[in-house]
């Protein structure tokens, strides 16, 4: 009997040992599963962060290519040789330089210099016909400009300016150009106007009642940039012996516009800052002005 009791106790002890071993194994398995679940949770959070970053980049890229659906086309004019108001020194070269830079950036260029009234209106009409829906459009004008009754006009080389009505007939309305681009369905229009915003007729004693270019309002999908603030002179040169052949605004613009992956907002912040400093260095004031209704980003060199 005693022998049988000993055997039974041994069996029960082995049973307890097996149960404890199994429990320990189950605990280890549970801990491993818990660790795996925690690792999976962290991996899920990491993947979610990556997905959010990818979605943010996609959204940014979509904004950057908002205006990339169409072609890139530019209308560039530089008028130096005015017949009845003061001649300019650098407008023609400014237009040529900007035209070359835009060509390098992938734009189809329509470049014109020293246009009289007839030629300027014909060139504008031809350019309007080229613009297609979704195009990125850049309009660059270097020359004289004036405003009458709050309306901005870009002046051809043979402008007379004997009276306001004559200027309205002979000059080109800036707003008309912008309206034409909108009518043609341009995806984005950037107007760069490197013109004095004082009165070019003042020294000639003409009583036209006009003053420098007026503040304006861009419509959706357009950005308008004046090289100088209202009533300011856009400097051709910093001083008579200035060795740089381009006007102050254009020389800075040329340096900034071809920096890769630089948005127009960043370009213009840099341009404005440097133009202000350059003008200040010779005791002048010139502050580029921007009127912006663009949607998304524009890059000269994406």
Language model features: what each stretch is:
Residues 1-302:
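Cysteine endopeptidase catalytic domains of the caspase/legumain-like
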């Amino acid at each position: 009997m005693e022998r049988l009791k000993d055997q039974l106790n041994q069996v029960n002890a082995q049973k307890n040992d097996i149960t404890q071993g199994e429990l320990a194994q189950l605990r280890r398995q549970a801990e491993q599963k818990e660790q795996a679940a925690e690792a999976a949770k962290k991996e899920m959070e990491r993947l979610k962060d990556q997905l959010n970053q990818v979605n943010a980049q996609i959204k940014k890229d979509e904004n950057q290519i908002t205006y990339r659906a169409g072609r890139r086309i530019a209308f560039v004019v530089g008028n130096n040789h005015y017949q009845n108001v003061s001649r300019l020194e650098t407008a023609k070269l400014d237009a040529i330089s900007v035209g070359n830079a835009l060509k390098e950036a992938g734009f189809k260029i329509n470049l014109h210099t020293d246009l009289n009234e007839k030629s300027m209106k014909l060139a504008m009409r031809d350019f309007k016909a080229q613009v297609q829906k979704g195009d990125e459009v850049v309009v660059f004008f270097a020359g004289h400009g004036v405003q009458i009754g709050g309306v901005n006009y870009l002046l051809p080389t043979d402008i007379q300016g004997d009276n306001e009505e004559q200027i309205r007939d002979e000059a080109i309305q800036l707003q008309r150009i912008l309206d034409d681009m909108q009518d043609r369905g341009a995806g984005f229009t950037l107007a760069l106007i490197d013109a004095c915003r004082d009165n070019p007729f003042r020294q000639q004693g003409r009583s036209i009642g006009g003053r420098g270019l007026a503040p304006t309002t861009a419509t959706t999908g357009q950005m308008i940039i004046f090289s100088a603030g209202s009533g300011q002179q856009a400097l051709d040169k910093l001083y008579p012996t200035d060795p740089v052949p381009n006007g102050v605004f254009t020389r800075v613009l040329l340096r900034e516009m071809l920096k890769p992956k630089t948005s127009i907002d960043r370009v213009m912040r840099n341009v404005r800052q440097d133009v202000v400093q350059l003008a200040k260095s010779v005791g002048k004031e010139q502050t580029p002005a921007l009127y912006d209704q663009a949607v998304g980003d524009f890059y000269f060199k994406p």
